[in-house]
Curated annotation (Swiss-Prot):
Parts of the chain that traverse the membrane: none
Catalytic activity as recorded in UniProt: alpha-D-glucosamine 1-phosphate = D-glucosamine 6-phosphate
Stored SUPFAM superfamilies: Phosphoglucomutase, C-terminal domain, Phosphoglucomutase, first 3 domains
Keywords on record: Isomerase, Magnesium, Metal-binding, Phosphoprotein
Species this chain originates from: Rhizorhabdus wittichii (strain DSM 6014 / CCUG 31198 / JCM 15750 / NBRC 105917 / EY 4224 / RW1) (Sphingomonas wittichii)
Amino acids binding Mg(2+): 102, 241, 243, 245
Enzyme class, first EC level, given as a word: isomerase
InterPro entries cross-referenced by the UniProt entry: A-D-PHexomutase_a/b/a-I, A-D-PHexomutase_a/b/a-I/II/III, A-D-PHexomutase_a/b/a-II, A-D-PHexomutase_a/b/a-III, A-D-PHexomutase_C, A-D-PHexomutase_C_sf, Alpha-D-phosphohexomutase_SF, GlmM_bact
Cofactor dependence: Mg(2+)
Protein name: Phosphoglucosamine mutase
GO terms under cellular component: cytosol
CDD domains for this protein: GlmM
Length: 445
């Protein structure tokens, strides 16, 4: 049976519409709290959020839910998703919660859950929590209701942890860095960490007002960052998304560097230092075939998973890899973090930039990607991928791309979208096949 609330990255949707209502958020708090109340000790949950307007409402609803079943709440305020994961483990909490819709606009919000080890919950845990949402709740006795308090030291603790991932013998002195925080969760901690390491810093996207998160800024819209890098003659530009678990880089010439290129860079660097485990990296089916070929030339493998950084992390843990990620900019380095951390990843890139002495435009473009095209088709309902004409269009494209490329068609786990991606050596064929499938999906939807 399909899950009603949880998608590929927790629960997400438009605020004040199911499942992102205060009522459901309170029930999630109760259900998750009940699921993680184990033993006789006092239970705690760490809660962070990004800067969107609805964060206050969702935070209050979750606190009501958790405290009603006897869990104490540690409130971090606006903090990156990886900070919540790190502090959940550091504070020995039973559960961590991030209130964010990541790269989505302010009208959406979401709930991501982390276990006491700082890793995102498994499908089994999420399914168990979802099952509890439909059952009666056992509330705590009056004397056992949980308490809530805010922790003011959270920012400093996270900045310290992030900086510890940067080589001690290096500094960023003399490096002109433009950072775009997307008016999101990292608007304070990211500039602070870079400044403390000595960077000549130019900050953008650091004035959140509740509705401007990810609005023409951040990792999903780098145009302003590209312009600023060129205008200021910066050495590099850093773009984070709303909850700072993604990283996209802009080189000194204003060109965008995606997650595939960044994974190639950090993997080769780690391999050279003897620090790469697993004999390669983990990425999703969306990563470019050029990355796979490049790694093979270095004697390294690419292990692919379905889309979602949590599935990347699960494969990394199961197979013994320590570097993985997604083309979209989730870069996971389990030597430093339990989930994608845009700031940690940025520091690893900056470390290699400083050590190499090369300009970013020369260092960061590790391989020539194959022509790749991704288009999204919005649909109102139903199952357009089961339509006969859509199935036929996909089969035709697969046949024509056999041996020279790949085709990935999937339903988004966070939005009502069908994502159509094709790549291959023939750019015109790739474009034609994507358009062919998108047209069929639109007619079916």
């Amino acid at each position: 049976m399909g899950r009603r609330y949880f998608g590929t990255d927790g629960i997400r949707g438009r605020t004040n519409e199911s499942p992102m209502t205060a009522e459901i958020a309170m029930k999630v708090g109760q259900a998750a709290g009940a699921h993680f109340v184990r033993g006789e000790h006092r239970h705690r949950v760490v809660i962070g959020k990004d800067t969107r307007l609805s964060g206050y409402m969702m935070e209050s609803a979750l606190v009501a839910g958790f405290t009603s079943v006897g869990m104490d709440c540690v409130l971090l305020g606006p903090m990156p998703t990886p900070a919540v994961a790190m502090l959940t483990r550091s504070m020995r909490a039973d559960l961590g919660v991030m209130i964010s819709a990541s790269h989505n606009m302010f009208a959406d919000n979401g709930i991501k859950l982390f276990g006491p080890d700082g890793y995102k919950l498994s499908d089994d845990d999420e399914t168990a929590i979802e099952a509890r949402l439909e059952k009666p709740v056992k509330l705590a006795a009056s004397a056992d209701i949980g308490r809530a308090h805010r922790v003011e030291s959270a920012r400093g603790r996270y900045v310290h942890a992030v900086k510890s991932s940067f080589p001690e013998h290096l500094r960023l002195d003399g490096l002109r860095v433009v950072i775009d925080c997307a008016h999101g969760a990292a608007y304070e901690v990211a500039p602070l960490a870079l400044w403390e390491l000595g960077a000549e810093l130019i900050s953008m996207g650091v004035n959140p007002n509740g509705v401007n998160i990810n609005d023409q800024c951040g990792s999903t819209d780098t145009r302003a960052l590209q312009d600023k890098v060129r205008e200021t003659r910066a050495d590099i530009g850093i773009a984070l998304d709303g909850d700072a678990d993604r990283l996209i880089i802009v080189d000194n010439e204003g060109r965008v560097v995606d997650g595939d290129q960044l994974m190639a860079l950090v993997a080769v660097g780690a391999h050279r230092r003897g620090e790469l485990r697993g004999g390669g990296i983990v990425a999703t089916v969306m990563s470019n075939l050029g990355l796979e070929r490049f790694l093979a030339e270095q004697g390294l493998s690419l292990h692919r998973t379905k889309v979602g950084d949590r599935y990347v992390v699960e494969a990394m843990r199961a197979e013994g890899f320590n570097i993985g990620g997604e083309q979209s900019g989730h870069i996971v380095m389990t030597d430093h973090a339990t989930t994608g951390d845009g700031l940690v990843a940025a520091l690893q890139v900056l470390a290699q930039l400083v050590e190499s002495g090369k300009p970013a435009s020369e260092l960061l473009h590790q391989f020539d990607p194959l022509p790749q095209l991704l288009k999204n088709v919005r649909f109102a309902g139903g199952e357009p991928l089961k339509d006969e004409k859509v199935i036929a269009a996909i089969a035709d494209a697969e046949e024509k791309l056999t041996g020279t490329g790949r085709l990935v068609i999937r339903k988004s786990g966070t939005e009502p979208l069908i994502r159509v991606m094709a790549e291959g050596e023939d750019k015109r064929l790739v474009e034609a096949m994507v358009d062919q499938i998108c047209d069929a999906v639109r007619k079916a939807a």
